[in-house]
Amino acid sequence: MRFDGREKNALREIEVTPDYLMHPEGSVLIASGNTKVICSASVETKVPPFMRGEGRGWISAEYSMLPRATNTRNIRESSKGKVTGRTMEIQRLIGRALRAVVDLDALGERTIWLDCDVIQADGGTRTASITGAFIAMVMAIAKLDEEVPFTKFPVKDFLAATSVGVLEEGGTVLDLNYVEDSAAQVDMNIIMTGSGAFVELQGTGEEATFSETELAELIALGKKGISELIEIQKETLGDKITARIKGE
């Protein structure tokens, strides 16, 4: 039993509020325990310069955190005049993950921007951002589909992410909060599709190593958590959109 009462294979309580913002084509507030992220999807009828004239679309992401999303205030990156390496890494991760499940040819020559804004952080902000951004992105694409139906729905599969880790006294665990993440001997982020394919594995030992057996346990925990997250995504999006993703 962990200090917050969860079993080792339990996600934190997940709540998804769709249409959280009035202006974007798609938006959600996703809460993973005390971590809360607003994810919005905006559609632009243009693509980056390197893709012009190809007839293909693009998915890109931006990530930020409110100054007091954390225990102590952080200076806004706009005040610093530059984006930190961590932020750049997370933005690229979100965009790369989402592009893995989108047929960019079917999307057509348009860009979908995903903005992930952390309003409260308690560990797992990047994985919550990916899980929430997927929902917002699909909502935006579904609106395009209602206006002019796609011959082939661009979203090929569901996608979600979670964290797993190894604690000194708790062994392998699913969905680490900040306290656990700070003390973890091993921390890993897992991104998977609804069909069970891996998009990304990011695992690191912190002054520690991990065995092949522990790696297998971590992956099994991640698969369980992602399966549960994808069910929540399906419930949020509804049967009609879920059927479009399945090609029905």
From Swiss-Prot:
In the record, biological process GO terms are:
rRNA catabolic process; rRNA processing; tRNA processing
**What superkingdom does the record give?**
Bacteria
Q: Enumerate the Gene3D superfamilies for this protein.
A: GHMP Kinase, N-terminal domain (3.30.230.70)
Q: Which UniProt keywords apply?
A: Nucleotidyltransferase, RNA-binding, rRNA processing, Transferase, tRNA processing, tRNA-binding
Point out the coiled-coil segments of this chain.
none
Q: Which CDD domains does this one have?
A: RNase_PH_bact (cd11362)
Q: What is its EC number?
A: 2.7.7.56
Q: Which GO terms describe its molecular function?
A: 3'-5'-RNA exonuclease activity; tRNA binding; tRNA nucleotidyltransferase activity
* SUPFAM superfamilies in alphabetical order: Ribonuclease PH domain 2-like, Ribosomal protein S5 domain 2-like
Q: What reaction is this protein's catalytic activity?
A: tRNA(n+1) + phosphate = tRNA(n) + a ribonucleoside 5'-diphosphate
Keyword tRNA-binding assigned to the entry: answer is yes
Q: Which PROSITE patterns match?
A: RIBONUCLEASE_PH (PS01277)
* Pfam name, any one: RNase_PH
Quaternary structure and partners: Homohexameric ring arranged as a trimer of dimers.
Q: Please give the HAMAP family that the UniProt record associates with this protein.
A: RNase_PH
UniProt record similarity statement? Belongs to the RNase PH family.
Query: What function does this protein fulfil?
Result: Phosphorolytic 3'-5' exoribonuclease that plays an important role in tRNA 3'-end maturation. Removes nucleotide residues following the 3'-CCA terminus of tRNAs; can also add nucleotides to the ends of RNA molecules by using nucleoside diphosphates as substrates, but this may not be physiologically important. Probably plays a role in initiation of 16S rRNA degradation (leading to ribosome degradation) during starvation.
Q: What is this protein called?
A: Ribonuclease PH
Q: Which organism is it from?
A: Listeria innocua serovar 6a (strain ATCC BAA-680 / CLIP 11262)
- Give the encoding gene's name: rph
